[in-house]
Amino acid sequence: LCDADYSQIELRVLASMANDKTMIDAFNSGDDIHTITAAQVFGLPVDMVTPVLRSRAKAVNFGIVYGIGAFSLSKDIGVSRAEADKYIKGYLATYTGVADYMEKVISKAKADGYVTTLFGRRRYLPELSSSNGMLRAFGERVARNAPIQGTAADIIKIAMVKVFERLKKELPDAKLILQVHDELLVECPERDAEKA
């Protein structure tokens, strides 16, 4: 079995969709995005970021993509709600493009009734006009998340088609057998492992 995966695809999609220069620079530097985020959010030099702080920054990075709030983040990483709120605010102050994107995507979703991926797929959001506040809040989380997750899914699907076609031409004994999140698994003879 051979595998290939996209490194932090959803965060990269977020950086692109939000056109967040700080996040794009962090990815382009080749450094670990979670360590960079921890350093920026907690105001530390990169070499002083501990594994615990990196783990908290990772939870914030991915939590933002999923529309996490302070209550859920506090439970996920074992800190007070006030501390979790401080982390989220620090993150959004660091990645101002992400903060702007989050506001704009919700406003647009409320006006249009849907959000789209970069490839044009729509996710309709009737929850945004609900009289139930919890449903509206859910709709806002989905409005922030669906374009990012959906675009990442679109990219993976396109990659699957391209890998399938290329394997068919170049390595007929190799088979694309599984997709797991941002990873593709190929079964092939050992002699073809490097090419696959």
Label the predicted regions.
Residues 1-196:
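Conserved catalytic core of nucleotide polymerization and phosphodiester-bond processing enzymes
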